């Protein structure tokens, strides 16, 4: 069983104006502070390339993608990257993937975003076969792939993104974990976890522990709740309130929202943990005790970003 320290990861690279070298330096610093798990999303930078560079400067911290978008990257191309990274940092990569959103895949990449969960199921089947077995013979709706390279394998854990109930169920069926993002904790406990376990049971995986649910949580290191809520509003409304998958999830979680609107205060209050280091640590411990398997802690800067990142990282490392 993982220790509490191993169950709490730290998000880096959230700044879209951040240079790659800055993200690498944060990963190196986080390991130096005692952090066991790093998570990084796929913004305008390539996460796996950053991880490859960071892996040469670190020795133990686990590196998790949250997430790599599936539609723009063929599973064989992703497998090539993963094989290289696993050779540089054996056993340290946790590969989180997901279908992303129509406004991104169609609006930015110009690709079709049809049947995202069907596409994700096929993607994981091809990717796992190539990585874990070195061979695949797959003929489906989205992929026709025949490969046989048994000498190049890497049993890298494959986690998938999940917001809706069907996505959590799919994660339980096919993945090595589910990655949530901005999901209220009651929704995760009452909808996400049961669906994850249902999927695992349907796939005949009930003999072993179900795949872990990694819960994304927002943290503001301030005792001023108004500042914390303002930071939460800015983050949610800038990144997520205009995306239908999030609006649907918020509504099903009991926080009705509409596309492009301001997030309700009660939703932001539910999502943001605030206080000094001791108060935040207590709340994170409570979340782990509630039934969540792991936490992905995302700092909401208030005043001094560098200082707050340092303090939060130290708090996590001291679990």
Residue ranges with predicted function:
Residues 1-319:
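Active-site-adjacent structural elements that line small-molecule/cofactor binding pockets in enzymes
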């Amino acid at each position: 069983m993982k220790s509490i320290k191993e169950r709490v990861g730290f998000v880096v690279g959230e700044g879209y104006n951040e240079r790659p070298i800055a993200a690498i330096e944060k990963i190196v610093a986080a390991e130096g502070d005692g952090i066991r798990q790093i998570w990084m999303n796929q913004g305008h930078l390539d996460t796996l390339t950053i991880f490859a560079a960071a892996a040469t400067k670190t020795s133990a911290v686990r590196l998790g993608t949250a997430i790599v978008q599936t539609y723009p990257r063929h599973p064989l191309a992703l497998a090539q990257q993963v094989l290289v990274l696993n050779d540089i940092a054996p056993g340290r990569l946790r590969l989180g993937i997901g279908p992303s959103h129509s406004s991104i895949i169609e609006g930015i990449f110009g690709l079709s975003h049809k049947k995202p969960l069907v596409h994700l199921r096929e993607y994981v089947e091809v990717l796992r076969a190539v990585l874990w077995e070195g061979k695949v013979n797959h003929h489906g709706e989205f992929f026709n792939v025949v490969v046989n390279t048994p000498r190049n394998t890497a049993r890298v854990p494959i986690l998938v993104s999940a917001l809706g109930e069907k996505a959590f169920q799919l994660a339980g069926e096919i993945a090595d974990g589910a990655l949530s993002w901005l999901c209220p904790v009651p929704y995760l406990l009452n909808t996400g976890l049961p669906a994850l376990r249902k999927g695992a049971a349907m796939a005949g995986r009930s003999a072993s522990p179900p795949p872990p649910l990694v819960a994304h949580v927002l943290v503001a290191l301030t005792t001023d709740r108004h500042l914390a809520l303002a930071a939460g509003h800015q983050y949610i409304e800038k990144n997520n309130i205009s995306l239908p998958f999030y609006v649907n999830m918020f509504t099903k979680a009991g926080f009705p929202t509409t596309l492009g609107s301001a997030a309700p205060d009660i939703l932001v209050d539910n999502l943001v943990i605030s206080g000094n280091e001791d108060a935040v640590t207590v709340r994170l411990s409570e979340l782990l005790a509630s039934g969540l398997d792991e936490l992905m802690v995302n700092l909401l800067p208030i005043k001094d970003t560098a200082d707050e990142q340092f303090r939060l990282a130290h708090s996590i490392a001291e679990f």
